[in-house]
């Protein structure tokens, strides 16, 4: 990671000198998506933990060609002013794929007072859904692979799982009608990541890329028996180019 620790006197992170990218591009964790993004978390005040969707999503950082040539940073009107190479970042990625840290996602039971994880569940894709914690001791989360999972809040054990066949970003919600408790989830992916194409191995392919990004509202209750038919995978093969007949 780009910082070795946090200086508890100043509250500032202490930069890792081994990952300085002034002279040579470096893989940095976390990348610009952060170790946690906007996906909802859930707070358990009784247990003193936060159930947190987290991610390791690295990005290659290098200085712009202009800075390398002149040593001077100039502000760019009407564009991003990050001081790093943006236009050529795709080539930087291709040049450094062998050294890329593996992107991963996590569901963490995190103690915000100690900074210690009580438990961690690893997820094969980094861009997953928000979290719902219940008074019954369950933690629900949907993931990029399309699974809605209920975990034991004490140890992270998966107790129940349902394949929605669509990537999930939204958090589940719970409500009660006539004494019956329900859990609902809105499936569907969004953001630029969905349109970036197939992820590079070993990152798992998101369900919305495999089956199409068809959002659904699904509702569950104990004893519910409705089934969801498995869709056909989308054919994304490149068709054969037709013969050129122009002269």
Regions found by a protein language model. Name each.
Residues 1-33, 42-49, 55-122, 176-247:
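Extracellular/periplasmic ectodomains of large secreted or surface enzymes and adhesion receptors
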């Amino acid at each position: 990671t780009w910082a070795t620790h946090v200086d508890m006197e100043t509250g500032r992170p202490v930069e890792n000198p081994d990952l300085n990218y002034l002279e040579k591009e470096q893989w940095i964790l976390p990348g610009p998506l952060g170790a946690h993004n906007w996906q909802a978390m859930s707070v358990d005040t009784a247990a003193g933990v936060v159930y947190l969707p987290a991610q390791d999503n690295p990005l290659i950082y290098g200085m712009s060609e202009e800075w390398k040539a002149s040593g001077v940073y100039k502000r760019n009107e009407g564009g991003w002013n990050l001081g790093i190479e943006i236009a050529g970042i795709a080539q930087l990625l291709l040049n450094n794929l062998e050294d890329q840290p593996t992107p991963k996602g996590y569901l963490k039971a995190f103690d915000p007072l100690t900074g210690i994880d009580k438990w961690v569940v690893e997820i094969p894709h980094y861009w997953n859904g928000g979290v719902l914690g219940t008074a019954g001791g369950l933690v629900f989360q949907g993931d990029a692979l399309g699974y809605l999972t209920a975990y034991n809040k004490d140890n992270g054990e998966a107790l129940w799982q349902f394949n929605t066949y669509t990537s999930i970003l939204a958090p589940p919600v719970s409500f009660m009608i006539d004494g019956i408790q329900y859990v609902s989830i809105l499936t569907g992916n969004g953001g630029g990541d969905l349109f970036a194409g197939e992820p590079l191995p070993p990152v798992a392919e998101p369900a919305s890329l495999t089956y199409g990004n068809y959002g659904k509202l699904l509702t569950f209750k104990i004893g519910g028996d409705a089934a969801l038919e498995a869709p056909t995978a989308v054919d994304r093969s490149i068709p054969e180019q037709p013969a050129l007949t122009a002269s």
